[in-house]
Each structure stands twice: as C-alpha cells, then as structure tokens.
C-alpha cells in the first residue's frame, strides 16, 4: 500500500478561456497524477454543482478560487494518508465530506479534480497506462467516435437550433482508420461550405458553425460531404445529432421554440419531425431530443424510435444512477451519455456505465464544450469498453488531444485492440 502524501490544486483555463480546477496528487512511493476538470455550456439542471466564485471583479464571476481552496484545505486534509489505489474509498471520503446530494458545498469540480488525479497517481506509481489501471487486462475496445462537425445551439453563434451534427465512422476497421475517415470528411465539408458561401468559423467543439436556412439543411450537407469524401452514407459513415432540446423548450407554453424556422412545436410534433429526419437520412443516434423533465414525452419518443435509432440521455440522466434507474424502469431512452463532471467522481461514473450495460443500454463517454488538454476520457472509454466516445471535431487541440491519445492506446494494445464500429450499437435494428 502506498498512501497519498500531498495534494495541490490551482486555477487554470479551459478551451473557452474560463477558469477551471487542476489538481495534483503525490504518493509516498513517487507516484504523481495531474488532472484538469472540464465545464459545460448547455448543462442539465440536475448536474452536480460546479462551484464558481461569483466575484464579478475576476473572470466575470467565473473564478474557481473557492473550489481550489477546498481542495488545498478540507479535501487534502481528508484524503492525505489514504491508499492511492483505493479509488472507491477516496471518492466516498470526499462525497461524505461534502455532505450534500449534488456536491454543492465543496464543488463537483473540486472533488472530481482529486478523484481523477488520484487515479493517475496510482497508475503512475504502478507503471501502468491509465486505461489498463482502470480497466485491467480486459480493456481492449476502441470507441466508435461521434465527431461534431457542424455546431449549433449554445455551441455556436448561428441560427441552427440543434446543437450538434456528428459523423460516426461505423464502417471503419480501426480507430486509426476512423480518425482518417472523419478528418477527410471534415475537410471535404469545409470545402463544400466555402463553395456555398457559408462561414467556416468553428464553434466551441471544433465544428463549423454556418448560418443555414433550417434544421434539416445540415443533414443534406453532411450526406453530400460524406459522398464527396468517397464514403457511403450510413454504411461507412453514419450521422448522429444532439438536439439539446431543453435549451429551446419553453416551460410555460410547453413548446419547442425554434429560431431556424420560427416555429413552435408540441412534444408530439417535434417527435414527428425528428422521426422524419431519422427515416430520411442515415441517422444512427439522437441525443436529448426532448426536454430533460418531459419523462412522458421521452417514453413516447422511445416507443416510436427506440428500435431503429440510439436515443441518448444526457441532460435527462446527468450520469446519475438515480435518474438512469428511473429511465430504465420507464423504458426511456436506450443509451446514456457519460460526463465525468456531471456526477463528480470516477467511482460514480463507473457505476453509471455498469448500470447502463446491465440494462442493455449503450454508454457514450463524452467531453464537455469547455475542454482542456486533459485526456482522461480517452483512457476511461477504453478502460470500460464502453464502445463510443463523443469528443468533438477534427480541429482544436483540446479535441484532437483525445483522438491522439486513443490512437496511442490502439497502437499500444496491438493485435488485442478491437474497433467495433457499427457493432457498438448492439441494441438497434435499423438497416441502412
């Protein structure tokens, strides 16, 4: 047993220039781990609390000095002396210390930074790559990536309501090939947008953010870009999209209010619109199609589309086993998005992935729109054999860092590496 001997946190910046928490953990046998916490723009109201200072004289109130002080003070005092390899004890100690159901006292950003840095320190001490330390000898599945190539909603300053339009190289034979296919399609898409006189400025996650005439036009453009890049839509590269519908849902009128076409939709009308898109285009995955609190709407949506498309709950489940359990019992969605900072510890993240798998749900490990150079999620997705990752486009170093780490992992695994592609969607029946 080797214990944690020191913990140090500091305020650093994320990919949007906003402050976030970085923590370092040291062990008595020389182990060292460092981790940086990401942050989201479109956040579920049930997420664990990201503690911000609120001091308008610093970073517009977005500073995280209080969270940093919590790490260097209370958390360090409680965690120093614990076995660095006992991840569950480390995480539970911080959860108990916080004492709130949403980590609102110490901050999920403070707690998560130590949770992740501790795992890295343990892996370092044992001389293991993080994915192998977390997943053991069975960690061997490389994820099928969701590459966010057109941004809308809160991730871009344009008139597209749907937040993310993604390509998924489901026909690739390896992660390396998937990255190449994605990059080639990304560059083809850029040329196509330039031909149309559209902007090729990129959004928070590295995708293009053109002003398009409605929410269907991105699908048309993506199909053309996939074909121009030399691939078959659906067979080689499928389409996924994230509505982030809570962001344009009016709680008073209970309508979905879209900017792109200036319309208001009931849940049933919006479901029908999405169903038409799924039937018309090679769509394999839909995320957050309805408001996070519209459980009955989600149930109806799942009944109508659940056998032919992956339905991912992000704001609905917020990586929380309580909400996921409710969804499983109700027959809501068939997949969960996994975001470390939605729940706040590595242990709870593993529990959510395990619960999803046991229920026949897929799990998609995800970045946040405010990212950093930290590549923990690349190791996490392989460690858990989750099979899918959502980590942005083929631009911006904060996104590319994860793809590069995945390629390193695939190389290290050698002949044992497995890329499942279309078979990552083990609960679907749609034929392309």
Curated annotation (Swiss-Prot):
Family: Belongs to the enolase family.
GO-annotated molecular function: magnesium ion binding; phosphopyruvate hydratase activity
Subunit description: Homodimer. Probably forms octamers.
Domain of life, source organism: Bacteria
Cofactor binding annotation: Binds a second Mg(2+) ion via substrate during catalysis.
PROSITE patterns tied to this protein: ENOLASE (PS00164)
Cofactor(s) recorded in Swiss-Prot or TrEMBL: Mg(2+)
The protein's name: Enolase 2
Entry-linked PANTHER family: ENOLASE
Gene3D superfamilies cross-referenced by the UniProt entry: Enolase-like C-terminal domain (3.20.20.120), Enolase-like, N-terminal domain (3.30.390.10)
Enzyme class: lyase
């Amino acid at each position: 047993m080797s214990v944690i001997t020191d913990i140090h946190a500091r305020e650093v910046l994320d990919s949007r220039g906003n402050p976030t928490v970085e923590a370092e953990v040291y062990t008595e046998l020389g182990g060292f781990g460092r981790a940086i916490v990401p942050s989201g723009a479109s956040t579920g109201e049930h997420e664990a609390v990201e503690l911000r200072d609120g001091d308008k004289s610093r970073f517009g109130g977005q500073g995280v000095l209080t969270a940093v002080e919590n790490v260097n003070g209370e958390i360090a005092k409680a965690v120093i002396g614990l076995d660095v390899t006992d991840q569950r004890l480390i995480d539970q100690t911080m959860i108990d210390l916080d004492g709130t159901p949403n980590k609102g006292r110490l901050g999920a950003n403070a707690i998560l930074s130590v949770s992740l840095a501790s795992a890295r320190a343990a892996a370092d001490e044992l001389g293991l790559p993080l994915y192998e330390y977390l997943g053991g000898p069975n960690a061997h599945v490389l994820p099928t990536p969701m590459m966010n190539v057109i941004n809308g909603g809160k991730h871009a300053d344009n008139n597209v309501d749907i937040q993310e339009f993604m390509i998924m190289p489901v026909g690739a034979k390896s992660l390396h090939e998937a990255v190449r296919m994605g990059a080639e399609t990304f560059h083809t898409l850029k040329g196509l947008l330039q031909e149309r006189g559209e902007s090729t400025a990129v959004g928070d996650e590295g995708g293009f953010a053109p002003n398009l005439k409605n929410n269907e036009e991105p699908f048309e453009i993506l199909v053309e870009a996939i074909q121009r890049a030399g691939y078959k839509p659906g067979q080689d590269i499928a389409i996924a999209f994230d509505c982030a519908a809570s962001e344009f849902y009016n709680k008073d009128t209970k309508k979905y209010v879209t900017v792109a076409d200036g319309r208001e939709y009931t849940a049933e009308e919006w479901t029908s619109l999405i169903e038409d898109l799924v039937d018309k285009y090679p769509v394999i995955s839909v995320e957050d199609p309805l408001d996070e609190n519209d459980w009955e709407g989600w149930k109806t949506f799942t009944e109508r589309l659940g056998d032919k498309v992956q339905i991912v709950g992000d704001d609905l489940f917020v990586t929380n086993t309580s909400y996921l359990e409710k969804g499983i019992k109700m027959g809501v969605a068939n997949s969960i998005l996994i975001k470390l900072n939605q729940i706040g510890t590595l242990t709870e993240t593993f529990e959510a992935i395990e619960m999803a798998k046991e229920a026949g749900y897929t799990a998609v490990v995800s970045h946040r729109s405010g990212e950093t150079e930290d590549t923990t999620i690349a190791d996490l997705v392989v460690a858990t054999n989750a099979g899918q990752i959502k980590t942005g486009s083929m631009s911006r170093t904060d996104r590319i860092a994860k793809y590069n780490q995945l390629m390193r992992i695939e190389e290290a695994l050698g002949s044992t590496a497995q890329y499942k592609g279309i078979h990552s969607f083990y609960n679907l029946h749609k034929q392309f």
